[in-house]
């Protein structure tokens, strides 16, 4: 099972501590701000409010804040031997092409990357370049579509909000795509339940969950 760190810490020491706890993959959220790729968890709460952005209960009206970084700066602190999950926060195929250029420029081989996103076209661009892609499933309509097998070709996995997952739904999903990733799971008992259901990986902010997943 893959233990995935939901957020990549802002120091190399904290990243190493997560790797020591069992995290094998570090997630970064990549969005494009005025055409520039930026690692950031701050997103508009609704499509009609592009100027207001939030990360949980933190809000900002600023176009860019200090917590938002270039991808290269984040990659520098991820421990050697760990993979990177780029959660692509755009449905623009041109942005996907830019992402491929960024990935190639790092010199890190495709085996060191996963790319998740919602848009089949964007994922197809990334997959065509040889990178592993995950379809991100967060809404009920997306989940129903995945249950019915409405998935893009060539996926390495689907990554699903964990509250949608139980024995029946995991079984149905795995008939269409054998690898199901659950996010974001911070309760150890829930991680144990999901592991017993056969998920292939768990995204978490909890080092105890990373330790458990890495032990499976």
What are the roles of these predicted feature ranges?
Residues 1-216:
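Phosphate-group recognition and catalysis centered on beta-loop-alpha active-site segments
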